[in-house]
């Protein structure tokens, strides 16, 4: 966009909305898309705008079978809005755009821009080109043009941040289309990662989550199998960084040096999300998961030996082609043995373009649903039992923003414990801010949250809370600009159980 057009955009405050679907990597990319648009002179549309913006960007997911229907349904709802709003533009990016390309404009000719996973930095240019030429711009790159972390960013929080350490994936899981859309794994330089973290901490961020499709394969580019554990230890030496998390590792690459680094680095949190996908060796082989049940449970045993307080969660697919009742019972057995704090269970969804889509033995939906309900019931009880063990414990909870839907009605606040469990607690007499740390005693446990009903034992104001206060005060005084931070607090939330395995799954 030319300087004249940029000035015009600022003068009339052209607005934008970014809608994000799918995994944490997409959320990370959407922060960059927002930063790019604000750098081009757009301002963020108010919450609840529901498409009432000058530019609406869809950052799509291609994992679920109904991802296409969801996108085109939403695009269809915007079509009449566009006819009533002169100059409105619609852009579609992400994995579904990378996959479908020309199909999107054929099915929704009112779309102005289609871009892929490798060229998100081109969005402002493509929007301007579409405006000037008055025709749709479709540009899909086949390889990464710029590491997303180098792009302008508009983060949503002043106290917690995603930090991407790699993009792409070298695995060939038969159910997953993501490697074909995100490309081969490409690692970021360790020095660049640490420099970004240090800059974030200087801005007030106190928690970071290292992000990649397969984080513990980090270093494969240079042949250093211990690069990820070294990175964790390096994070432990950054003054002011209180909490470090990561997502998601692959069991194949989960080595003892990583477990040691987790246990020996105080600011690496006692939490592990490691996708199992199935407990059946037969199904794991069909999935090309390159580990078996014994190996997976062995990793969990080692993690718990090193960190007895660790909360371990996972992803599981039910109804993969060829899964027998015996195979499913092996998954149930593995869940009983592992005793996950949480498990995100998904009904298998056929994705065109994946080997699993053409496999024999596709399971009837009613069978998949019945197994899914059995597994969900088992995990619900285990989650509750594991949470009950927290009652009576004293925990340091980092105050969150927007985590408790009922906080206003219950006069409580919410936050995350070190192991990432959600805690609702009584408001202390002293005012606290997101990013501050409150020490509480747990009095009650539910399957998906903990409750601390007594007066908090201590409140610690933090630089992160200061940063949030400064950010909030500044936002009230002037339009939002390019910020540092992250949506939400704690590790990025996994997809809801109704969804599908995320791109970040190992």
From Swiss-Prot:
NCBIfam families per the UniProt record, alphabetical: miaB-methiolase, MiaB/RimO family radical SAM methylthiotransferase
Enzyme Commission number(s): 2.8.4.3
Cofactor entry: [4Fe-4S] cluster
Cofactor stoichiometry and binding remark: Binds 2 [4Fe-4S] clusters. One cluster is coordinated with 3 cysteines and an exchangeable S-adenosyl-L-methionine.
Location of the protein in the cell: Cytoplasm
Subunit note: Monomer.
Function in brief: Catalyzes the methylthiolation of N6-(dimethylallyl)adenosine (i(6)A), leading to the formation of 2-methylthio-N6-(dimethylallyl)adenosine (ms(2)i(6)A) at position 37 in tRNAs that read codons beginning with uridine.
InterPro entries for the chain: Elp3/MiaA/NifB-like_rSAM, Methylthiotransferase, Methylthiotransferase_CS, Methylthiotransferase_N, Methylthiotransferase_N_sf, MiaB_methiolase, rSAM, rSAM_horseshoe
Residues involved in [4Fe-4S] cluster 2 binding: 169, 173, 176
Reactions performed catalytically: N(6)-dimethylallyladenosine(37) in tRNA + (sulfur carrier)-SH + AH2 + 2 S-adenosyl-L-methionine = 2-methylsulfanyl-N(6)-dimethylallyladenosine(37) in tRNA + (sulfur carrier)-H + 5'-deoxyadenosine + L-methionine + A + S-adenosyl-L-homocysteine + 2 H(+)
Record's protein name: tRNA-2-methylthio-N(6)-dimethylallyladenosine synthase
Organism, as annotated: Streptomyces griseus subsp. griseus (strain JCM 4626 / CBS 651.72 / NBRC 13350 / KCC S-0626 / ISP 5235)
Boundaries of every TRAM domain copy: 388-456
Residues reported in the UniProt entry to bind [4Fe-4S] cluster 1: 23, 61, 95
Domain Radical SAM core: 155-386
């Amino acid at each position: 966009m030319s300087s004249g057009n940029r000035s015009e955009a600022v003068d009339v405050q052209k607005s934008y909305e970014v809608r994000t679907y799918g995994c944490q990597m997409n959320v990370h990319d959407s922060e960059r898309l927002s930063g790019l648009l604000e750098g081009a002179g757009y301002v963020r549309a108010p919450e609840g705008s529901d498409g009432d913006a000058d530019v609406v960007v869809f950052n799509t997911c291609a994992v679920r079978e109904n991802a296409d229907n969801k996108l085109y349904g939403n695009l269809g709802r915007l079509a009449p809005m566009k006819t009533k709003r002169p100059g409105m533009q619609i852009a579609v990016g992400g994995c579904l755009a990378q996959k479908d390309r020309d199909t999107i404009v054929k099915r929704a000719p009112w779309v102005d821009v289609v871009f892929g996973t490798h060229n998100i930095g081109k969005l402002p240019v493509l929007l301007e080109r579409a405006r000037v030429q008055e025709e749709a711009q479709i540009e899909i790159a086949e390889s990464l043009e710029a590491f997303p972390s180098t792009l302008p960013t508009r983060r949503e929080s002043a106290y917690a941040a995603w930090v991407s350490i790699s993009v792409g994936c070298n695995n060939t899981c038969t159910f997953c289309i993501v490697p074909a859309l995100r490309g081969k794994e490409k690692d970021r330089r360790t020095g660049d990662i640490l420099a970004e973290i240090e800059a974030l901490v200087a801005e007030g961020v106190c928690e970071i989550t290292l992000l990649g499709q397969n984080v513990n394969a980090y270093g494969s580019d240079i042949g250093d199998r211990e690069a990820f554990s070294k990175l964790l230890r390096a994070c432990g030496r950054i003054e002011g960084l209180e909490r470090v998390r990561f997502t998601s590792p692959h069991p194949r690459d989960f080595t003892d040096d990583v477990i040691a680094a987790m246990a020996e680095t105080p600011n690496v949190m006692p939490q592990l999300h490691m996708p199992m996908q199935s407990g059946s060796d037969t199904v794991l082989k069909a999935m090309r998961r390159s580990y078996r049940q014994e190996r997976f449970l062995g990793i969990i045993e080692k993690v718990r030996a090193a960190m007895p307080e660790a909360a371990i969660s996972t992803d599981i697919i039910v109804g993969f082609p060829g899964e027998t009742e015996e195979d499913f019972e092996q998954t149930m057995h593995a869940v009983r043995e592992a005793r996950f704090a949480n498990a995100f269970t998904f009904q298998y969804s056929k994705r065109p373009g994946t080997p699993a889509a053409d496999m024999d033995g596709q399971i009837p939906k009613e069978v998949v649903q019945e197994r899914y309900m059995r597994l969900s019931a088992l995990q619900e009880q285990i989650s509750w039992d594991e949470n009950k063990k927290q009652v009576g414990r004293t925990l340091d909870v980092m105050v969150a923003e927007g985590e408790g839907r009922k906080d206003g009605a219950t006069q409580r606040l919410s936050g995350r414990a070190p192991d990432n469990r959600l805690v609702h607690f009584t408001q202390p007499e002293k005012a606290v801010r997101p990013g501050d740390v409150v020490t509480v005693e747990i009095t009650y446990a539910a399957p998906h949250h903990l409750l601390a009903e007594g007066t908090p034992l201590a409140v610690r104001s933090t630089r992160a809370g200061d940063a949030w206060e400064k950010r909030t005060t500044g936002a009230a005084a002037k339009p939002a600009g390019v910020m540092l931070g992250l949506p939400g607090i704690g590790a990025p939330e996994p997809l809801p159980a109704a969804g599908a395995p995320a791109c970040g799954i190992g």
